[in-house]
């Protein structure tokens, strides 16, 4: 986890969010305060810590205005485990479908991956050295010893598939001769100089366990985990390049070098203290009519989510995790329903409310130009790989923003995502022809934009389908 990130002041956090997200200052301020409060809580005495729960946030605003991106970027700034789920994917306990506890298990999986990646980075040099030593032996193998063992009758019955658990599965090798030692020394130098990266080598890799798809999602996962622990891991041979083999072997050696149990415990603590769960489309499970069966089911999902927000002990394959100090961010457009349509207990668990504004033409202009890797910069970089230089004029960017805004007004308002569809449509011909026009320079002007888009953007029926 990035310990420096969590110490950032709210101003610093907002400043970092501004590098990627345009506008929505109120939302940025509130998530920055929530993040800073976590740091403040970490400095308190243990008994004080237990009394202070995070203030969950409810974001209200149309799609494409930055709700998810603000939460995701915030988590990335501090290296906190983050998971996005959709409330509509869950079903009430007792029905077929995902139960709400699965989002906590998914968060723990993310935390485990974060912790293990960090620990692996600390032993990367040692793991890479071991991987290179192994590669040298694979490229210049010793003679194999003949296996002195009789046939197991069960092997014939099961097609030779009975593993010999009592013995080492790798074939034993003869001690290397002087000639082999000399060759290995030469190969080692060539490996260090990067001369053998494209050479092919055969290595043994763990085979992915077969999926058990006939059961429901959660039952499937639990039984799959149990079977994976009981059954020995099967390895298969693959022919890969030296470069790929080094990555695979280094990852395997890094796994062996880190303490798995300690890593799992640290991941559980990280998920408990720093985990962020983003519940999207929470407005879709809100209801103001409790008569229909569908509304009763939606209310059931709300009641299932409630204990997790209040603090529950959830069993995962890595151990039990407490949700009491996780930060939950609910989000929804609330076009049809209102936050007050959520059950009162759930409303009370989202004390911080923030309304995100719809995007204006000026916002679209800023989105196209200001972020660290804005959409315009992305397309310029992509086409530059084909040696095609694309230059967007300020007037062209203004025209693109106006068209995006107008199409959003005339059809469904999908916020900044409209810019993706419009840019893709405008640059479709150029992207197709780019490989055959090296060293070309293309100036994107308002006239170019209109030639490619005006006939579509002015026709509401066409723009509804194409843009």
Swiss-Prot record:
GO molecular function: ATP binding; ATP hydrolysis activity; peptidase activity; proteasome-activating activity
Region listing for Disordered, in residue ranges: 166-185
Domain of life: Bacteria
UniProt entry tagged with the keyword Acyltransferase: no
Record-linked Pfam families: AAA, AAA_2, ClpB_D2-small
Coiled coil segments of this chain: none
GO cellular component, one term: HslUV protease complex
Compartments, as annotated in UniProt: Cytoplasm
Keywords (A to Z) from UniProt: ATP-binding, Chaperone, Cytoplasm, Nucleotide-binding
Entry annotated with the keyword S-adenosyl-L-methionine: no
Chain residues that bind ATP: 22, 64-69, 280, 345, 417
SMART domains the record matches: AAA, ClpB_D2-small
Record function comment: ATPase subunit of a proteasome-like degradation complex; this subunit has chaperone activity. The binding of ATP and its subsequent hydrolysis by HslU are essential for unfolding of protein substrates subsequently hydrolyzed by HslV. HslU recognizes the N-terminal part of its protein substrates and unfolds these before they are guided to HslV for hydrolysis.
Complex formation: A double ring-shaped homohexamer of HslV is capped on each side by a ring-shaped HslU homohexamer. The assembly of the HslU/HslV complex is dependent on binding of ATP.
Similarity field: Belongs to the ClpX chaperone family. HslU subfamily.
Name the UniProt record assigns to this protein: ATP-dependent protease ATPase subunit HslU
Species: Staphylococcus epidermidis (strain ATCC 35984 / DSM 28319 / BCRC 17069 / CCUG 31568 / BM 3577 / RP62A)
């Amino acid at each position: 986890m990035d310990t420096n990130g969590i110490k950032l002041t709210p101003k610093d956090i907002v400043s970092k969010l501004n590098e990627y997200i345009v506008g929505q200052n109120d939302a940025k301020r509130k998530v920055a305060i929530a993040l800073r409060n976590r740091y403040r809580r970490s400095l308190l005495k243990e008994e004080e810590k237990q009394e202070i729960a995070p203030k969950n946030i409810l974001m209200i605003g149309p799609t494409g205005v930055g709700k998810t991106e603000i939460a995701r970027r915030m988590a990335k700034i501090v290296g906190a485990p983050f998971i996005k789920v959709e409330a509509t994917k869950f079903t009430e306990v007792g029905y077929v479908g995902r139960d709400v506890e699965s989002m906590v298990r998914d968060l723990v999986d993310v935390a485990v991956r974060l912790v293990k990646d960090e620990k692996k980075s600390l032993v990367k040099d040692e793991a890479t050295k071991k991987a290179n030593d192994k590669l040298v032996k694979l490229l210049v193998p010793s003679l194999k010893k003949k296996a002195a063992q009789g046939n197991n009758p069960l092997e014939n019955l099961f097609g030779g598939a009975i593993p010999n658990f009592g013995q080492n599965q790798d074939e034993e090798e003869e001690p290397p001769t002087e000639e082999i030692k000399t060759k290995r020394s030469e190969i080692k130098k060539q490996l260090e100089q990067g001369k053998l990266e494209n050479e092919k080598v055969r290595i043994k890799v763990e085979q992915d366990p077969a999926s058990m798809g006939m059961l429901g999602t959660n039952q499937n996962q639990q039984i799959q985990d149990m079977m994976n622990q009981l059954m020995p891991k099967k390895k298969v041979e693959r022919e890969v390049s030296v470069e790929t083999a080094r990555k695979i072997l280094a990852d395997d050696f890094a796994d062996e070098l880190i303490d798995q149990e300690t890593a799992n415990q640290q991941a559980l603590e990280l998920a408990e203290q720093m985990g962020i769960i983003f519940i999207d489309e929470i407005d879709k499970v809100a209801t103001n009519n409790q008569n229909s069966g569908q509304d009763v089911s939606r209310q059931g999902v709300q009641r299932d989510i409630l204990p997790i927000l209040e603090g529950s002990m959830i069993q995962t394959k890595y151990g039990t995790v407490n949700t009491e100090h996780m930060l939950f961010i609910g989000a929804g457009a609330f076009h049809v329903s209102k936050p007050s349509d959520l059950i009162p207990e759930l409303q009370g668990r989202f004390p911080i409310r923030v309304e995100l504004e719809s995007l204006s033409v000026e916002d679209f202009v800023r989105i196209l130009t200001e972020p660290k890797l804005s959409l315009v910069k992305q397309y310029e970089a992509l086409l530059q790989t084909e040696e095609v230089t694309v230059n967007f004029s300020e007037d062209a960017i203004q025209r693109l923003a106006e068209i995006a805004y107008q199409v959003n007004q005339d059809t469904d308002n999908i916020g900044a995502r409209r810019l993706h569809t419009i840019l893709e449509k405008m640059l479709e011909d150029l992207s197709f022809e780019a490989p055959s026009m090296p060293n070309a320079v293309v100036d994107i002007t308002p006239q170019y934009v209109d030639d490619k888009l005006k006939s579509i953007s002015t026709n509401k029926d066409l723009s509804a389908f194409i843009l």
